[in-house]
UniProtKB/Swiss-Prot annotation:
Protein function: An aminoacyl-tRNA editing enzyme that deacylates mischarged D-aminoacyl-tRNAs. Also deacylates mischarged glycyl-tRNA(Ala), protecting cells against glycine mischarging by AlaRS. Acts via tRNA-based rather than protein-based catalysis; rejects L-amino acids rather than detecting D-amino acids in the active site. By recycling D-aminoacyl-tRNA to D-amino acids and free tRNA molecules, this enzyme counteracts the toxicity associated with the formation of D-aminoacyl-tRNA entities in vivo and helps enforce protein L-homochirality.
UniProt catalytic activity: glycyl-tRNA(Ala) + H2O = tRNA(Ala) + glycine + H(+); a D-aminoacyl-tRNA + H2O = a tRNA + a D-alpha-amino acid + H(+)
Annotated source species: Geobacter sulfurreducens (strain ATCC 51573 / DSM 12127 / PCA)
UniProt protein name: D-aminoacyl-tRNA deacylase
Motif Gly-cisPro motif, important for rejection of L-amino acids, residue numbers: 137-138
Keywords for the protein's UniProt record, in alphabetical order: Cytoplasm, Hydrolase, RNA-binding, tRNA-binding
Gene: dtd
Superkingdom classification of source: Bacteria
GO CC field: cytoplasm
UniProt keyword annotation of Nucleotidyltransferase present: no
Family membership: Belongs to the DTD family.
Subcellular location per the Swiss-Prot or TrEMBL entry: Cytoplasm
Domain comment as written in the entry: A Gly-cisPro motif from one monomer fits into the active site of the other monomer to allow specific chiral rejection of L-amino acids.
GO MF term (any one): Ser(Gly)-tRNA(Ala) hydrolase activity
Amino acid sequence: MKAVIQRVSEARVEVDGSTVGAIGRGILVLLGVEKGDTERDAAWLAEKMAGLRIFEDDAGKMNLSVREVEGSILAVSQFTLAGNCAKGRRPSFDTAAPPDEGKRLYDRFVDLIRETGIPTATGIFQADMKVHLVNDGPVTFILDTKSRSSST
């Protein structure tokens, strides 16, 4: 799984002109599921999202998690994160999980986040979505479950 995470002061996702998910302060997660990803990847990523200290404390250091600042998470599926632009001019999506598997693991990731008690909003899987955000910082990170160490 690949995730682009952004610390936001607010974010929302629209489908057909209607807001389907919105948060205030928190994390926007753009999530791409690849072939070979498992529930273990979803669990690792959900745990990482809940505990990642990317919010500033009183001293101005990134030392607080989304839970500690009583923030929320907006999770948006984005299969294009599995795209490969190394050859030619058009991306290849050969490594993207099939839609049914991608949806199953995306839904599992969302369920695991919700189980932590962090308020979580979502987009709609496979919909044409418009994502609006105010990136706070800006603070943006890229996580790939394939590059995690065995100790995390």
